[in-house]
Amino acid sequence: MTAETQTLNFGPEWLRALSSGGSVISPPLSPALPKYKLADFRYGREEMLALYVKDNKVPSDLLDKEFLPILNDEPLLPLALVSFTEEEQRNFSMSVNSAAVLRLTNRGSSGGGGTVVGVPRGRSSSRGRGRGRGESGFYQRSFDEVESGFGRGAREMHRSQSWEERGDRRFEKPARKEPDGVRGSAWREIPDRRRRFDYDLRESKDERGYRRPRSGSGIAEDERDSLPEWCLDDAEDETGTFDSSGAFLSSKPSKKVQKEPIPEEQEIDFHPSVDGAEVSDSDGSQTEEAKETDPVQSQNQDDDLSRNDHTVQAAPSPDHKTSSPVRRTDMTLDTAHQKAVSPHLSCKMDAKSQSPSSPPTPSKHKEDAASASHQGTREKAGPCLPHPQSPALSQRSPARQPDPHIVPAMSSVPVPQLDTPTVPIHSSVCAAPGMEPVPPEPDEDGLEHLEQQAQQMVAYLQDGTLDDDHLLTKVLDQRVKGPSLDNQQKWYYKDPQGEIQGPFSNREMAEWYQAGYFPMTLLLRRVCDETFQPLGDIFKKWGRVPFSTPPTPRLGDLDPERLSRQQEITALYQMRHLHYQQLLFQQQYAVLAQQQKVALSSQQQQLPLPLQPLSMRIPEHTVIPPVVRALSVPESTSLWELPPAPTQPAVWEGSSVWDLPVEPTTQGTTREQLAQMDKVKAAKMEQERREAELRAKQEEEEQHRRKEAEEERKRREEEELARRKQEEALQRQKELALQKQMEEEERQRKKELQLLEERMRQEEERKRLEEERRRQEEERRKQLEERKRAEEERRRREEEKKREEDERRQLEEIQRKQEEAARWAREEEEAVRLLLEEARLKAEEEERNKREEAQRQKELQRQRQQQQEALRRLQLQQQQQQLAQMKLPSSSTWGQQVTPSAASQSALSLAEIQKLEEERERQKLQEQRHQQQELKALQQQQQQQQQKIPGWGTMSKPTGTTKSLLEIQQEEAGQMQKNHQQPGRNRPANISLPVAPVVNNHISSPTVGNSGSSVWGSLNNNLSPQWSSDSMSSIWGSTDVKGSSVGFWDDAVKEVAPRNATSKNKNNASKSAGSNSRQSKKVEQEEKLLRLFQGANKCQDDFTQWCEKTMHAINTAHSLDVPTFVSFLREVESPYEVHDYVCAYLGDTPEAKDFSKQFIERRTKQKTSQHRPQQDVAWVTCQTSQANSQPITLEAVQCAGRKKKKQKMVRADPSLLGFSVNASSERLNMGEIETAEDY
């Protein structure tokens, strides 16, 4: 055949584009695939599973709004890792189309015990298995593949089967090779594996061709006969065409005698179809569908049926080439191998076997047994009786043309058929309109013709009445439904591109479904329905093919309970039908032996015997219920209660079958038949001999067939039981697996929920702890600030308290000083008075001793030299004091003490006294100038020393110079107290002063005392704590009645006095006026030295004490020498530098800044008020002396005038100080301590 005949030449263009290029019935021997090429990269199942990544994100191409309704964020697991659902297991166990057809036709599998006829086994056995071919297939197990002892064990279904093994395309959309084709909806699908071919990629090239499936019997000849002749190997030279329905019409006459119609059938116009199972579907569904789709032609149903017998007589339904959006090659192959054998065949065999003149041949017996066994297997939806036809209808049928709508409808449902070589089979569905069947071969003998006639009569008598009932019921239904039902029953469906196609009639939909174009996922609806539903759901609800003729309810009208009840009743009637068939066969076989022995005269009495089942006919008013319309069995008839077949002929109202009331056309037909049978009698008598020889063999084969039928029935019952058990086990297993999966999912969900709750609780706990910690830190910070504020407040209160205490103490000190000054003033006045009195007495005594003055002049000269020596020592002592930065104010003149001079001094003249005074003034001036120079030099040395020693703040605290000097003074005072218990009284009485000098000294003495009391009183309080009152009392002593006082520098006088006394004792001479002048010089030198000490100790005033106290409070974390730092700060003039030094050494704190500020203010006040008290003291002294109305000498005036002048450096005697600070010749101010023993 040419390539043009292999492609679809009808149907929509898009459907022809999806065609794989082969025939609907079966693919060509070698697939022609010019449009596809192999993928560059091909992967196996394990490789694809290894490539699966669970965490893959959704591609950006699918995030468009267009895909949001169908987009799933989480990727699906590979199906190999997912267990079967109940629906998948059922679908994989049997093809959905095949299962539906089997349920509709009440048939299981063929009697061979293999696969369902037409279902390919193995991989790559059919084309269209690849993706993108627009075809779909399901894995199918044959009915007898259950676990029984007769057939092969059931094949267990696993996910390990590849898509190619399963042929499952339900979850995929067909992809196109063109770039603009619709892509699949699964985003995780690998595009390289999307377009695969229908054959295995691992097969060799010679294995890729078309492979014919095995039949149940495994006989190659059966396989060959099950195929249409145009696709056989020996039909290469045949040519033919396809009619409008897609059926193949051969242009040459068939060579097989068995596949030609009987010429006598044409003569009597009674043509029972060999494919009667297709025509007489369970309840005449094709006829009913034809009536529904064409109500006008349903009025002439009798003519249509007779004409259908002409056109359909041997056509297998798969030859219809109709277009549909989705092709199913499985169904194509399935229907290609199915050959329908109607119950007419069995009835013909029975009638033929009853004929005495035609003994059955072995092949005919086998045919009868096979037909019986085949009828016993139609359990799913099954029609058991053939479609009725009356003789009148068969006579009128040649006068009418067949209805083109009825022809395909009558073969719309495929039925598994028995492969028998003796049954006439045509390869086409129906002949072209107007074509006559091919004439029979001339070698066909009359015996075969008579047998066919007998079979036709038996079929007519058995089924005539039942089919009349069906026709009457359908006509009534048609009248009730009205002409509008045709449009309401039309179908719409959505093609893979999402476009709605339709409307189409039931006939067209049934043809496309039968050809395998519709998958179970196809969305369709009728005109009367509102929504689209998948084809699989409609199958479940209706329990049959929705395109069949019986009136279908609206989608959703059938409830599950009613459906299950219908299925149970259907199964019951199937079992009853099996039993009825077995009884019928037994009766026929029993009568067969008697027919061969009876003479021709008894032929009419024997004819009713095979018609014995007619006793079970029901009244005409019986209506078949809608639940069992597909059974063609009366509801009120119990097949189990059928009476056993009598051995004698059963007689009804008439004496024979010819007495039945029939129409005139029927009586004419029977007369012709009787005439023909008379002619046959002679021929059968000639063949009695041959039949007698075959009789024994026939009986033996009959018994064998009975046994086989019984065994087949038992086997099928066992298979059914095993299948049910297996299904129940699978169902239980699925339920358990589903329950486990649900439990696991529930546990997983609970676990995830617990984890989520735990995570949320931890998060809340962490937030709470964080909040608590933050609150605690805030409270801690507030408490710290509160403590700091309280500490500052406490410190401020303490400072305020200290300040108030200092002010109070200062006031008390001022009062005490004032009282002390007043007391000292009184004491000084008393001392002056006593001194004046004593001076008067001494003056008188001096007058008496004037004569002795001349004698003691020499001694006086010697004393003067000693006094000069003491003065030098005093100057050395002043140098040492200057090193300690001790200065005495120039106004302090209290250190001057009045030394009683000798009586001989009074004898001096006034000129001498004046000369002595001038000389003393000149010496004082020189000493002052020398002292100033030394002070300047000492200051320069101290400045250089301070510059040379950096980091004085970190040096260890040096011992205060005042403290060491105090210790020395205390030691000296102790020695003086031991040596001179009464220093005032031990003085020599013969020493007297001249009158004038005495008055001068006495007048100046109160001034000095008053000034000293005010100065040293303040020193008592302002010096460091070493200067206690006890030490002062022991050092400074107290004034006696005579006016002599033990002062700080009285030791020099004490040393001089004993020496003078010793010299006086040795020389027994009185003191001269020169000794008086020396004494006055010594007093002045001591006064200067005291001024130095007063200047040094003045640093320990209130300001210094405040500085040290405040710095001790601040300097808690610093190792700082406070006195040294205070003395250093006092020398810093710039306030900014003071602030920088304080912040550098005490820290940049508010306390340090406050201290620097107060330090600058207090120092400014102290400097401004430093000079005024000294001047006030000097003026107070002068006023006090004036109040006493004492004459002021020139010396007092000169001393008062020199107070404002800068004093000269006074050298201190090392013997008085106890140490020497003489600088070495090489280095300045680097001396060594010298003790008193060194002199």
UniProtKB/Swiss-Prot annotation:
SUPFAM superfamilies: GYF domain. Residues 231-240 have a biased composition (Acidic residues). CDD domains: GYF (cd00072). GO terms for biological process: insulin-like growth factor receptor signaling pathway. Residues 241-252, 888-900 have a biased composition (Polar residues). Residues 105-184, 206-409, 678-749, 763-812, 843-960, 1057-1085 are annotated as: Disordered. Residues 153-181, 257-272, 318-331, 678-737, 843-862, 914-933 have a biased composition (Basic and acidic residues). Pfam families: GYF. It comes from the Eukaryota. Residues 488-536 form the GYF domain. Residues 863-885, 901-913, 934-948, 1060-1077 have a biased composition (Low complexity). InterPro entries: GRB10-interact_GYF, GYF, GYF-like_dom_sf. GO terms for cellular component: cytosol; membrane; perikaryon; proximal dendrite; vesicle. Component of the 4EHP-GYF2 complex. Belongs to the GIGYF family. Key component of the 4EHP-GYF2 complex, a multiprotein complex that acts as a repressor of translation initiation. In association with EIF4E2, assists ribosome-associated quality control (RQC) by sequestering the mRNA cap, blocking ribosome initiation and decreasing the translational load on problematic messages. This is GRB10-interacting GYF protein 2. The lineage of its organism: Eukaryota, Metazoa, Chordata, Craniata, Vertebrata. The gene is gigyf2.
